[in-house]
């Protein structure tokens, strides 16, 4: 498994960079293959919205200038990663300009996967968790705004797939000068938990059976049978009336999705509960 640590700070020292160092130190101590990307050391060009926003980024999902500025190679590293830690200083309640520039270009290439020339293409963020760290030099009042900024950018880059959980956020960590010590501990624990969560058995196959049962096989060859009839018969889910609809269940990650309903209903196979 590969962790990509993406740094949006222009410094190689100070508050924000100390969290970059903590993320790398944690990954190394856990035996996680990791790499730090210091965006400030790159010379990425800003998105030029080629052809009125309908350039090769839209149709073929790479940047026409990306071979020269390093963006296309960086996007390949995003593809190869299994999880991400984004670390940014907070400037005017938003992520840093370097990180914003990178996310603008990445969003142009990834959010359009469903609409371009390759209909089977999926976002490089699909089913990959992210931790977002926002470090403020003052009291931290700008951190919520930076989180919203990052959530919107990463969520959009996750593609036009439903459910939006495909671009997952494992944790948001707000940092200031006074809480930095215990927030470093929190970051270390978050990385450990994120990879423990990632290593859980994934669904291999799901077979709907009679009486609203699902026979599930995981990728470690473990098998389980889940009975969801008590949930299905509740008043709130009365629209799901027959086994025909049940057999249309689709599988994503560890969740079952019922598309026939007006609202997409999710069942967590870990707990057997509606989400």
Regions found by a protein language model. Give the residues of each.
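N-terminal beta1-alpha1-beta2 submodule of the flavodoxin-like/Rossmannoid cofactor-binding fold
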Residues: 1-111, 115-116, 163, 172-177, ...
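Short, acidic Gly/Pro/Ser/Thr-rich loop/turn segments
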Residues: 11-13, 138-140, 265
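Short secondary-structure boundary/capping segments
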Residues: 75-76, 121-123, 248
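Short, glycine-/small-residue-rich phosphate/pyrophosphate-handling segment
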Residues: 113-163
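Motif-centric detector for short Cys/His coordination patterns
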Residues: 195-275
């Amino acid at each position: 498994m590969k962790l990509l640590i993406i740094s949006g700070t222009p410094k190689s020292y100070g508050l924000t960079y100390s969290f970059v160092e903590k993320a790398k130190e944690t990954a190394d101590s856990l035996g996680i293959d990791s790499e730090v990307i210091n965006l400030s050391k790159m010379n990425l060009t800003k998105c030029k919205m080629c052809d009125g926003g309908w350039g090769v980024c839209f149709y073929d999902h790479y940047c026409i200038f990306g071979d020269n500025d390093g963006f296309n190679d960086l996007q390949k590293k995003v593809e190869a990663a299994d999880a991400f830690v984004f670390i940014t200083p907070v400037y005017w309640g938003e992520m840093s300009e370097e990180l914003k520039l990178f996310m603008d270009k990445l969003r142009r290439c990834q959010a359009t996967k469903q609409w371009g020339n390759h209909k089977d293409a999926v976002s490089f963020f699909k089913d990959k968790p992210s931790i977002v760290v926002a470090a403020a030099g003052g009291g931290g009042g700008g951190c919520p705004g930076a989180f919203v900024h990052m959530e919107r950018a990463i969520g959009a880059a996750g593609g036009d797939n439903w459910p939006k959980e495909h671009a997952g956020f494992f944790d948001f960590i707000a940092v200031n000068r006074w809480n930095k010590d215990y927030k470093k501990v929190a970051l270390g624990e978050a990385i450990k938990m994120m990879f423990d969560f990632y290593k859980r058995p994934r669904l291999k196959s799901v077979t709907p059976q009679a009486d609203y049962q699902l026979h599930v096989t995981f990728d470690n060859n473990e098998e389980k049978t889940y009975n969801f009839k008590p949930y299905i018969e509740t008043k709130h889910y009365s629209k799901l009336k027959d086994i025909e609809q049940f057999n249309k269940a689709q599988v994503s990650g560890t969740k079952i999705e019922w598309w026939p309903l007006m609202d997409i209903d999710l069942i967590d196979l870990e707990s057997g509960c509606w989400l």
